[in-house]
C-alpha cells in the first residue's frame, strides 16, 4: 500500500481511477489537535472533481495520524477534487484544514462501478452499530 503523508503535499495524490485500498493517506494532526482543543472527533469530507457535494469518508486513528484508506469510490472520478479534515469538539467545529486531491485517469477498463459514496459510508455505520450491540 502506498503511504501519503499530507505534510509533504499541497495536492494529495490519491492514486489512479479504479484502484481500491492502494493508498493510505496520513494526516499528522491527531495528537496536536487533541492537545489544543480537548477530546473530539475527526471527520473527513471528500469532493471528487464532478461532485456537486462532498461525501463523508471513514477515517481511523493510528498513533498521531488520522488515517484515510482510499477506496475505489474515492478515486472513481479522475481529476482534481478537494478533501477537508474537520475536528469537532461536541457540536462545535474546533479546527479544519482543506487540501486539493488528485486522481489519475486510467487508460484501461476500471472494473466494476463502485457504489455511490454514501452507500459505503452507510454500510460502515450500520456494521459498526451491529458490532456495538
Language-model segments: residues:
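N-terminal assembly/attachment segments of tailed bacteriophage virion structural proteins
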Residues: 1-111
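Non-transmembrane elongated oligomeric "stalk/shaft" segments that connect baseplates/barrels to distal
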Residues: 95-133
Amino acid at each position: 500500500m502506498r503511504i501519503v503523508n499530507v505534510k509533504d503535499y499541497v495536492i494529495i495524490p490519491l492514486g489512479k481511477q479504479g484502484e481500491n485500498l492502494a493508498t493510505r493517506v496520513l494526516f499528522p494532526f491527531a495528537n496536536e489537535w487533541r492537545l489544543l482543543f480537548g477530546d473530539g472527533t475527526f471527520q473527513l469530507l471528500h469532493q471528487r472533481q464532478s461532485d456537486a457535494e462532498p461525501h463523508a469518508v471513514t477515517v481511523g486513528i493510528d498513533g498521531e495520524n488520522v488515517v484515510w484508506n482510499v477506496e475505489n469510490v474515492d478515486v472513481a472520478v479522475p481529476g482534481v477534487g478537494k478533501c477537508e479534515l474537520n475536528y469537532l469538539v461536541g457540536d462545535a467545529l474546533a479546527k479544519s484544514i482543506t487540501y486539493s486531491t488528485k486522481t489519475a485517469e486510467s487508460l484501461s477498463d476500471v472494473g466494476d462501478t463502485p457504489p455511490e459514496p454514501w452507500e459505503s459510508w452507510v454500510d460502515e455505520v450500520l456494521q459498526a452499530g451491529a458490532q456495538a450491540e
